[in-house]
Amino acid sequence: MSQQLPDVQASSPDVTVGLNRVGVTGVEKLVKLGRRDRDPIVLMAEFEVFVDLPSWRKGADMSRNMEVIDETLETAVSEEAYRVEDVCGDAAELLLEKHDYTTKAEVRMEAEYVTHESTPASEMATQSTADIIASATATEDGTSEEIGARVTGMTVCPCSQGMSASRARETLKQLNVEDDVIEEFLETNPQAGHSQRGHATLTVQSDGAPEVDLNELIEVARDSMSARIYNLAKRPDEDHMTYEAHKDAKFVEDCVRALAEGVVNTFPDLPDDAVVTMKQSNDESIHQHNAHAERVAQLDDLRQEVSED
């Protein structure tokens, strides 16, 4: 006759303090992202899954919890999804149903997403990658979902460029070049500035599911920096990227503002209470530190601020 093992996790803790998030990270699953009239995209996604833990319970039954989590994720990813945030939402709701001691379930997913495009000058076929970010939080009051992406681009420092332009202006004056010719030259030939590799992160969260097209969101993020970058670049493409970046030099702060403007202009149908998170981090080329800026705001606030320009 087998003896039932004690359920230590269900006992009371020595210190009766509740925990906001208990769960697992690094759970890898295949996710099929459906496309109408086309083959689905298969993503290798990494999940984080959490529930809250009441003060009267010692633990979250990690081994048993993992069975529930695995079953939940398998159910959520078994069918093709057209929106990755819905995968997280379905998983969070199922997780909440299966835990009688929790009031909140959170599921977060990241995956690398590949799109096809052409290089800007030579028009050669290439691919671009972005990191998809999706999450969902389920409570008895409902489920909120978030969708976003993290992309890489190029930025040029306006301050450094301004100093180069000033030096060029003085040199041309010493060569007796007329002022209007100098200004026309500097306008059409942006001067050198130190560059950075930029990382833009943009997410949109709302109750239910945000009406956001993932590809459009990625486009907004890529266009927020001085220039896009490409995996494949022939010499004409390198020239194009360098020129475009120096023609639109941006501080890290300017990139976040461009994200805000892009969201407002691209997604007019999003509700005012949608929460937009915008982050920009630049890997500095001439400093040992990096630059960072961010803004988290409701969409109605961003709409008001952008309309004031």
Curated annotation (Swiss-Prot):
Gene3D superfamilies: Urate Oxidase. The record marks C157 as: May be catalytically important. GO terms for biological process: tetrahydromethanopterin biosynthetic process. It catalyses: GTP + H2O = 7,8-dihydroneopterin 2',3'-cyclic phosphate + formate + diphosphate + H(+). Binds 1 Fe(2+) ion per subunit. Keywords: Hydrolase, Iron, Metal-binding. It is an enzyme of class 3 (hydrolase). InterPro entries: GTP_cyclohydrolase_FolE2/MptA, GTP_cyclohydrolase_MptA. One of its GO terms (molecular function) is iron ion binding. Its EC number is 3.5.4.39. Its cofactor is Fe(2+). Pathway: Cofactor biosynthesis; 5,6,7,8-tetrahydromethanopterin biosynthesis. The keyword Magnesium does not apply. It comes from the Archaea. Converts GTP to 7,8-dihydro-D-neopterin 2',3'-cyclic phosphate, the first intermediate in the biosynthesis of coenzyme methanopterin. Belongs to the GTP cyclohydrolase IV family. Homodimer. NCBIfam families: GTP cyclohydrolase MptA. This is GTP cyclohydrolase MptA. It comes from Haloarcula marismortui (strain ATCC 43049 / DSM 3752 / JCM 8966 / VKM B-1809). The gene is mptA.
